Every structure is written in C-alpha cells, then in structure tokens.
Amino acid sequence: MRPAGYATAMNYSLRAKTGAEALEAVANSPFDKVELWWPWDTPHPSEQQMRQLVDALAKGRPENPRQLVALNLWAGDLAAGDRGVLHLVGPEEGADGAGAGTDPDAESGDPAITEELIEHLNVIEYLHRLTGVRRFNVLVGRGGRVLQRRQVRAFAAVAKRLARFEGIALIEPLSGIENYPVTSIKEAAPLVAAGGRLLIDAYHLAANGEDWTWLASRGAEYELWPEHIQIADFPGRGAPGTGDAPLEEWVNQLREAGYEGEVVLEHV
C-alpha cells in the first residue's frame, strides 16, 4: 500500500515522542515505504536496537518488508535543540562557507571528521546492509547563520564515506531554527557542490517564504535538482489539504520536469 494521491511514503518520526514510538508506528504501518529520523539517543546503537528497526520494517510482512527510503543521521540531542554536530567537527577556518569542493580523507588524518563520526558512519553502513537504505539526511549543526568552512569540509567527508556503499548525503533547508546556516536552496548550494544532494521539505521552504517551483523550469540536469521531497501543508504543518499550499500542483510540476524520487508525507 502507498499513501493516497501523489505521495509515495510516510515519515513516522515527526509525530512520535520517542524513537521507540516511531519504530512502533513503522511496525504497524500499512504503507510499503517509510522514512525515519534517527530513532536512538546514541550515535552507536546496539546490535539489538538495530535489529528492532529491521523487525519493525518486516512486522506482519516478513516476505516483503517495508522499504526504508531515507534516514536522518544522528544529529545530537534534538529535544535540547541540536540540529547536527558538524559545526563542532575540526578547527574553525573562517565563516565564509569556503571549502566547497574539497575532498577530505578522514582516514589520512584530515581534521574534517572525527573518530566518533567515523564510527557512526560505520553504523550507517551496517544499517544500509540490513535495510537497503541509501539516502541520509545530514544536519550540519547550529553554528550560526553563516555556513562555516569546517561544516562544508565535514559534510564533504561524510558524503565521501557514504558514497563508498552508494549512499547519498542529503542537505535540507530548515525553518524556525535559530543559528542554522541552511534555510534556502541557495544556502544549500555549497554542500551540494561538496558531494551532497538537495532534500526539499515543502513546509520549511513555504515557512521561509521561498518559492521553489522555479526548479521545474531547470530540469533534472540542474545541479540543485532535488533528490528527495517531503511535504506538509502550510500554514500549520498538517496533512495536505489542511493549509493553503498547492502541494499537488508543485509536485506535479516537478514530476513533469523529470523528478523521479520519493514524495514523503512528513506532517503533524
């Protein structure tokens, strides 16, 4: 089963109070495709915890498990306001967003990435082997409204390691978060240039007053073409139809222009 209409998958984390609650919702989902934020309070969950995710995907349908289409990387303590940790990785080298396009190699001692982050990415690769998930939302951290060079370098290092198993690092412009440097498509550009792909959340862009429908005129070869789309209505972040945003029209425009990815319901 798939969500009605133009959506293809459901995110079960936004409405959940805990990661365990999100996994329970996945286990009872009627849909074929699901998406999650990081469901554990540690970047290094145990084997048992990871197997609980696998079990949730397969519950009630062991021969045809639900597909995990995207997963947030660990982003710190979300309840405390964290939105990623890349602003804390490596030495500060200026706050001009420079460094896009560098090719850091963590294993050769590049300070762009820490051993803890490498261990987390090893967990991510293992989860990929368990579930097949390939798309990973990478939050860059609340280091200020200007993207720091070390954030770009760390993001590039993460994207490079994910690519070893055909993983894709997603960058998502957010709304309503103080001191977060990526709130528009333009601000995501240095991270796309560093090896990432754009994740569009229609609610966040509408909340920030950004019209993203111009992307349809650029076509699928455009460097900022979205890899992944999430939708919720605006205002309110409710289900489609609860607000004023022409979500179906926007999605159809991108489909007609060549978008072939997921359209994920992520609403309250």
In which residue ranges do the predicted regions lie?
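A structural motif
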Residues: 31, 130-133, 226, 259-260
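A cross-family glycoside hydrolase active-site/sugar-binding cleft signature
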Residues: 5-15, 35-37, 69-74, 136-139, ...
